[in-house]
From Swiss-Prot:
Underlying gene: MT-CO2
Protein name: Cytochrome c oxidase subunit 2
UniProt binding sites for Mg(2+): E198
Subunit structure comment from the entry: Component of the cytochrome c oxidase (complex IV, CIV), a multisubunit enzyme composed of 14 subunits. The complex is composed of a catalytic core of 3 subunits MT-CO1, MT-CO2 and MT-CO3, encoded in the mitochondrial DNA, and 11 supernumerary subunits COX4I, COX5A, COX5B, COX6A, COX6B, COX6C, COX7A, COX7B, COX7C, COX8 and NDUFA4, which are encoded in the nuclear genome.
Compartment(s) where it occurs, according to its Swiss-Prot or TrEMBL record: Mitochondrion inner membrane
GO molecular function terms noted in the UniProt entry: copper ion binding; cytochrome-c oxidase activity
GO biological process: ATP synthesis coupled electron transport
Cofactors that this protein relies on: Cu cation
Chief place of localization: mitochondrion
Domain of life: Eukaryota
Length: 227
């Protein structure tokens, strides 16, 4: 989860988020090199006393500043497209969970089970126990098995919402009348927090998401107790 004054991303807990962090570093390195080159050229232009008033064209320079940006864009686009297709790829999910956005709470349905569904509301600040997080705790957590591919079906009952869990690299719009899907796989157990990331009304800030990733055996015990 995020911490006060944190400058970086949250710790990655899924293969997709790890790829996104690598892509971020790759792109930031390219941006840093371009910025350094531009600043260096500007400093040379401001400090040099040489002028070239008779120069009308420079085909070699024009060729370089046409080809070089194209190469840079390709170096950014190729890994970006690779991650984009990885995020859309869903191969034989072990579990499917349907998520519906409401004003202002989430409801979840485990479609592989006959009658396993519940609503998830934020716990008011006045009801929090010591050690619990303000505006992030819910009365019903989404319990999921770790190290297994899980498909999330996401939609909305009323207005636009967005189901987002940063540490898993997930952010999918919940649109009324449309069913979007995303896949997640967690590499380690734990609690992972998210929030609605689309302004949806006066209580938009009070729609937290809490995923509890547990080993498969613990998930089976939990699902049996819920039925």
């Amino acid at each position: 989860m995020a911490y006060p004054f944190e400058l970086g991303f949250q710790d990655a807990t899924s293969p997709i988020m790890e790829e996104l962090l690598h892509f971020h570093d790759h792109t930031l390195m390219i941006v840093f090199l371009i910025s350094s080159l531009v600043l260096y050229i500007i400093s040379l232009m401001l400090t040099t006393k040489l002028t070239h008033t008779s120069t009308m064209d420079a085909q070699e320079v024009e060729t370089i500043w046409t080809i070089l940006p194209a190469i840079i864009l390709i170096l950014i686009a190729l890994p970006s497209l690779r991650i984009l297709y990885m995020m859309d790829e869903i191969n034989d999910p072990s579990l499917t969970v349907k998520t519906m956005g409401h004003q202002w709470y989430w409801s979840y349905e485990y479609t592989d089970y006959e009658d396993l569904n519940f609503d998830s509301y934020m716990i008011p600040t006045s009801d929090l126990s010591p050690g619990e997080l303000r505006l992030l705790e819910v009365d019903n957590r989404v319990v999921l098995p770790m190290e297994l591919p899980i498909r999330m079906l996401i939609s909305s009952e009323d207005v636009l919402h967005s189901w987002a869990v940063p540490s898993l690299g997930l952010k999918t719009d919940a649109i009324p009348g449309r069913l979007n899907q995303a896949t997640l796989t967690s590499t380690r157990p734990g609690l992972y927090y998210g929030q609605c990331s689309e302004i949806c009304g006066s209580n938009h800030s009070f729609m937290p998401i809490v995923l509890e990733l547990v080993p498969l055996k613990h998930f089976e015990n939990w699902s049996s107790s819920m039925l």
